[in-house]
């Protein structure tokens, strides 16, 4: 999903054949939507059928199936402090993935049935093979190829988090599982939203020719302001300029480290720096990239077990559009040193600022996700 976009026949054509397309149809693929390849005039792909936050599922696995508010969202599994091996980690993660993918499928299939009953799309069906021959609309499975494609993100963050545990707890043994868990539970000694904005001073002005920027006029913020409060101030300014009476507020409550001593904060921050300095996905390091691959394949293999009401297969995708930013707010601190509520990695790209060996190394890491 980068700029410029790159599409590779040597990867796409075999992938489509693996999905049941004939070789001729696979060779005739085109890119629709954002980046999705499909055979034109023969496919009802329903791409972007859902967004699936892999990092949130791993977050839930860390807490034994519970959300940050203590509510049991998934199956009861061993929480992170009870993981005695990588097998324990993967058992908890895979169990939660299985559960939440099943809920994704239930929701998508319900929508699919609603599409069939409420929006049969007869005109579009007349243009898609073989709806007329089968006597079915595309919503009933009239197309030759039928898919449902949910999109995942947070798989790179999850892979990096898994590698940090593997390296520091089970290999180097310089940190314990409990140490990492306690530091995460206190957001590494920082208040919620820390790490999102740490510049000394920012002034948004009308120098830009963009209309939205001009409408902002100027909003001054200090280094003590969180990103949420900065965004809130800017949006409120724009709304006021446009005469809108719409109000907007962003919850900027601090939920972390309210009971930390200075010594605890320093210790949690020390742990975060160790985790953050750990080798990361995107630098063509096999042992790191294989953790991201495993995290991704657990999700994708589970998705591909299911069929949709049109008789087609579920197929997993991995890109977020921009949901990695918004949905990062639902994910607590992770074992890779990421602060609570911070944005997640952009699709299968490395985490922001953690690819240090150039674009070819990043490309090599991405290529390992599905070998």
Feature roles, as predicted:
Residues 1-222, 229-231, 240-371:
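Conserved catalytic cores of very large enzyme subunits
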